[in-house]
């Protein structure tokens, strides 16, 4: 009996050891639950058929059911050997209690799953081949692609409008779908993966290109596709509105895809595409392109003309018109001056050429003006002599007052012949020294000192001052006019003919200054301005240099022009000069009709100038503070 008991005890020990050893790890007392991450991944990747078996409660119930069935089967085998032992009785009672406790939750919770499903959860065996796994993955991908719901554009807009109305009721600002690029994303990045068969290489390349795992230089070649297809739109809210492109969430993405990134926001791009595709814009763009071509051609033509004009200093057509206008103006001033200088009571300085002075009646002068207006009209010496003879035959002699009543060109257009407009045609010459002091002909400056003005006749000095009124500043003009008025008062006390000279001054071009003198307040201002008297003038080398420097700074004297510039003014390309002195004076051999009229400020003598080749007679006349020289070849 003891042996039998001993063997039974050994069997019991061995059986318990066997029982403990044969229990698998998966079916231990502690319930092993799968991780939530694994369950979510399976639930999102599998179809509706497999989702029912993956619920947590049904999975737990299946595990408990398998456990109870296996334990019952083992206990039924062990009951035959351990019926009579007291330990077996105790162990049986304990097992019954445990089974009763385990059956309580099973009776409370039904064994059926929440959602009925025919197939159970599949556990892939470790011996499964790679081909079978790939086939299963392809099948799942096809199921996922077929499960996508196709949404048309109208339904998407309706959905967006519904959401917009809901947000507007909550008093939020809603961005247009163009600003968030939602309508342009017809294919999402995830859906794009399931449109074709599964390929691991393509999936890896897509993953590497859409993440920051590679440098920009390596991925740059593969970015020829549309970058909008791979934008992650999960973090974009519909109600957000970005005023600036830099603040939008696509900024980082477009910055990464440098070659294919748009330079403007999606809203501007959409508007530009709409406008560019309109038929009206095509017509307008063609017209605009034609207009741009026209303006560009004009601009290039103008720049080319400007360049050529700078090379030649001026265009020939412009210079011809200016020459005609200047000639017409100077000829009229010549006639006015010759009429004004016929007064016999006023002697002229030096050797006055009385034969050249003539007075024309208004009828003859009007006829002359009409002929001068013609562009091809050129005055010759014979034409001038003809009018002189007609004036002598008629015996008409008009004074300066009577002639001022007639029409004058200076009154018609006084502002059109300013120093600014005449600046283009002006030739600045050096002043000539008096031939009484120097027999040699030199280009130098004449200095008018107070001693020289007091030495001659008073009437001659008055006439010279009236002719030489070329001062620029207002104070200088007032000073010179005050000197003239004082000399006139002294002449009135000494000479009875001074009244006539005062009348002549009142009717001359200095009438403005005479009328200005009639105001006593202005005379007091002039006297206050000239309280400081300068010391008497001394003709020295320093004084001549100082006077020359001052006249150059004030613009009364400038360097003479070059040979080419003088030839351009005359309009003669074949310019021939007899001597350099005549070139500096502007007297050149020209084939056009003479006399030519030149402007030279501060030249105040009537002299015959002789050279080796030709003789030039200068006749000086004055108008508007500018000296006019007309010279001809005899």
Curated annotation (Swiss-Prot):
> Sorted alphabetically, which InterPro entries does this protein's record hold?
DUF4553
Looking at the record's lineage, which domain of life comes first? Eukaryota
Q: What is this protein called?
A: Putative uncharacterized protein ENSP00000382790
Q: Which organism is it from?
A: Homo sapiens
